Amino acid sequence: MSKITEEEIQQILPINGPSFEEVKNYLYKYNNEYIVIKCGGSVLIDQNLFNNFINDISILNKLGFIPVIIHGGGKRISNKLNEAGIKSDFINGLRVTDEKSISIVEDVLNEFNKEITEALKKNGCDGQGITNKQNNILFVEQENQNLGFVGSPKEISQSIIEQIVSKKKVPVIAPLGLDKDNQVFNINADTA
């Protein structure tokens, strides 16, 4: 079933939650299934939420599920842009990413990616970063000229995810992609 014992599962279950038997049936049914989890940037900057998130991912992994993480970076990106004197504009909830801001967006997302993989490792769960610089899987087209360097995924290289999973690692995806000219684009984590 999984890498976790019945006793460990009992310790994880909420006091007023489902019985072990109910959970066991669910575990057998969905064992070895991919679970794609989007983690917003606000979770990543609140240490308590971040620690809970990392713990939950580790538990899912121990239970035999295959978590795949895609993360955002919203608030930290806004803070870094403000520090650089760059105003954040949004159109329909999407950050306008111009030539000045794309490198800051890229740096923040790659930094978060590294922090997540390191935290997973400290929690006994191997993570593998997927960024535009390392194992890029997202190939994009520009979403809209008014948004600047914001892309829409057109192709996803699933083979890289499968290779990482075959090594018993959790893929951690930064929402960045490359176009046909290898230009970096910011991607809304909800659509990546």
Regions found by a protein language model. Give the residues of each.
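Nucleotide/pyrophosphate-binding catalytic subdomain
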Residues: M1-A192
